[in-house]
From Swiss-Prot:
Membrane topology: Single-pass membrane protein
Main location, first listed in the record: endoplasmic reticulum
Protein location: Endoplasmic reticulum membrane; Microsome membrane
Cofactor needs: heme
GO biological process, one term: cellular response to glucose stimulus
Organism: Homo sapiens
Pathway membership, UniProt: Lipid metabolism; bile acid biosynthesis; Steroid metabolism; cholesterol degradation
Chemical reaction(s) catalysed: cholesterol + reduced [NADPH--hemoprotein reductase] + O2 = 7alpha-hydroxycholesterol + oxidized [NADPH--hemoprotein reductase] + H2O + H(+); 4beta-hydroxycholesterol + reduced [NADPH--hemoprotein reductase] + O2 = 4beta,7alpha-dihydroxycholesterol + oxidized [NADPH--hemoprotein reductase] + H2O + H(+); lathosterol + reduced [NADPH--hemoprotein reductase] + O2 = 7alpha,8alpha-epoxy-5alpha-cholestan-3beta-ol + oxidized [NADPH--hemoprotein reductase] + H2O + H(+); lathosterol + reduced [NADPH--hemoprotein reductase] + O2 = 5alpha-cholestan-7-oxo-3beta-ol + oxidized [NADPH--hemoprotein reductase] + H2O + H(+)
Biological role stated in the UniProt entry: A cytochrome P450 monooxygenase involved in the metabolism of endogenous cholesterol and its oxygenated derivatives (oxysterols). Mechanistically, uses molecular oxygen inserting one oxygen atom into a substrate, and reducing the second into a water molecule, with two electrons provided by NADPH via cytochrome P450 reductase (CPR; NADPH-ferrihemoprotein reductase). Functions as a critical regulatory enzyme of bile acid biosynthesis and cholesterol homeostasis.
TM region positions: 4-24
Protein name (database record): Cytochrome P450 7A1
SUPFAM superfamilies: Cytochrome P450 (SSF48264)
Amino acids binding heme: 444
Family membership: Belongs to the cytochrome P450 family.
């Protein structure tokens, strides 16, 4: 027994030595400082996952503005000086920004690769998104969202809820319920065969979405979904509801989904379920960050009396100028894109809310060995390494944003009450100072629609409802750090508020 134990001990020690000799990457001349971490494969992943912001700040103090960390078997070069961001983006010819995103999508949603290079489809999905989420297509999306929000938020004609007392509800739950239903109807249309049960069907999809989204960080980290039976079942049910045979029964489907259905049928070799799972990608992308962003915008506005007053006055003035009468029974509110774009106070409130809650990771994969030339030096990068920007470092930098942890509703307003676009670091004007939606080729193609959605929601909340936080609920809830790197962090706990219809 002792001999066997000794042999196993020697074998394990030998493996550890081999790993130390062969498995640890050595920093080469001209490369950034390197942190391999102590755990094989994981590297620094546990420290990064526990608190990305503090982990990166600590390495920034130790190594400077550029350093490399091993995370889940990948070598990630973090660029932390915001003055260098534009220089990084100038090296676009060396980057493959699609590789990581396509691989993550296939892993999380369960379809084959949607990268045209892999031969399963010839659709350029980014072009599809730009074509159907921006320009003229944005008009119909915006109009549909406003209509659906009011269908959900305004009382039915025969209802007595117009005179009801205060309703108390969790604010995050409220935002989740309203924005999910309105967004679902806007993107995927209304079911012609389920008029009576449509709301129940959407709420069932909402529950499945929550179950799936709960494990999404683990899926991105590389864990197989079969480890999470409930989430796997929820994902498959969501996909079933998005099969083409089901979508064809719906009316007022967005141009995005109509075009994607056509391109899936004509340009791909996906089976019916895989096609549905590519639509599930759209559902997740349209909801997962918009919902928490809506919550933070509403919460920060309500808890700040000055913000509430300024926003209410701006909305009232805009509606009057547009000739819109606010009524629970009359015509619904309708604002054009131009009118939505001319709301600097709401825009600043949303930007400030996202600045405080966004934790996105902007990444690109090196297609070949190359030299990265930045403001503070040049660095050799190896093929298949990852270049990463973590904008939360910039968003919470006191030199760029004084008193960075405090919500200031007018932070993005200039002295004339217009949108402020000038921010400085080390006395130099920043080209990139606000990046919750990514940057360059990886910038979110649906960002304009997302901002419109949140503005529309806030306009309707201010127009139709009296709003108050429950006593003792004004303290800002902590951010859920488990989703760091994925976008907008939701609150770790919900906040109770109360609302009732105004006497209009």
């Amino acid at each position: 027994m002792m001999t066997t134990s000794l042999i196993w001990g020697i074998a394990i020690a030998a493996c550890c030595c081999l790993w130390l000799i062969l498995g640890i990457r050595r920093r080469q001349t001209g490369e950034p400082p390197l942190e391999n971490g102590l755990i094989p494969y994981l590297g620094c992943a546990l420290q990064f996952g526990a608190n990305p912001l503090e982990f990166l700040r600590a390495n920034q103090r130790k190594h400077g503005h550029v350093f490399t960390c091993k995370l889940m078997g990948k070598y990630v070069h973090f660029i932390t000086n915001p003055l260098s961001y534009h220089k990084v983006l100038c090296h676009g010819k060396y980057f493959d920004w699609k590789k990581f995103h396509f691989a993550t999508s296939a892993k999380a949603f369960g379809h084959r690769s949607i990268d045209p290079m892999d031969g399963n489809t010839t659709e350029n999905i980014n072009d599809t998104f730009i074509k159907t989420l921006q320009g003229h297509a944005l008009n119909s999306l915006t109009e549909s969202m406003m209509e659906n929000l009011q269908r959900i938020m305004r009382p039915p004609v025969s209802s007595n809820s117009k005179t009801a007392a205060w309703v108390t509800e969790g604010m995050y739950s409220f935002c989740y319920r309203v924005m999910f239903e309105a967004g679902y109807l806007t993107i995927f249309g209304r079911d012609l065969t389920r008029r009576d049960t449509q709301k129940a069907h959407i709420l069932n999809n909402l529950d499945n979405f929550k179950q799936f989204d709960k494990v999404f960080p683990a899926l991105v980290a590389g864990l197989p979904i079969h480890m999470f039976r409930t989430a796997h079942n929820a994902r498959e049910k969501l996909a079933e509801s998005l099969r083409h045979e089901n979508l064809q029964k719906r009316e007022s489907i967005s141009e995005l989904i109509s075009l994607r259905m056509f391109l899936n049928d004509t340009l791909s070799t996906f089976d019916d379920l895989e096609k549905a799972k590519t639509h599930l990608v759209v559902l997740w992308a349209s909801q997962a960050n918009t919902i928490p962003a809506t919550f933070w915008s509403l919460f920060q506005m309500i808890r700040n009396p000055e913000a509430m007053k300024a926003a209410t006055e701006e909305v009232k003035r805009t509606l009057e100028n547009a000739g819109q009468k606010v009524s629970l029974e009359g015509n619904p509110i309708c604002l054009s894109q131009a009118e939505l774009n001319d709301l600097p106070v709401l825009d600043s409130i949303i930007k400030e809310s996202l600045r405080l809650s966004s934790a996105s990771l902007n990444i690109r994969t090196a297609k070949e060995d190359f030299t990265l030339h930045l403001e503070d030096g040049s660095y050799n990068i190896r093929k298949d390494d990852i270049i990463a920007l973590y904008p939360q470092l910039m968003h919470l930098d006191p030199e760029i944003y004084p008193d960075p942890l405090t919500f200031k509703y007018d932070r993005y307003l200039d002295e004339n009450g217009k949108t402020k676009t000038t921010f400085y670091c080390n006395g130099l004007k920043l080209k990139y100072y606000y990046m919750p939606f990514g940057s360059g080729a990886t910038i979110c193609p649906g960002r304009l629609f997302a901002i419109h959605e949140i503005k529309q929601f806030l306009i309707l909340m201010l127009s139709y409802f009296e709003l108050e936080l429950i006593e003792g609920q004004a303290k800002c809830p902590p951010l859920d750090q488990s989703r760091a790197g994925l976008g907008i962090l939701p609150p770790l706990n919900d906040i109770e508020f109360k609302y009732k219809f105004k006497h209009l």
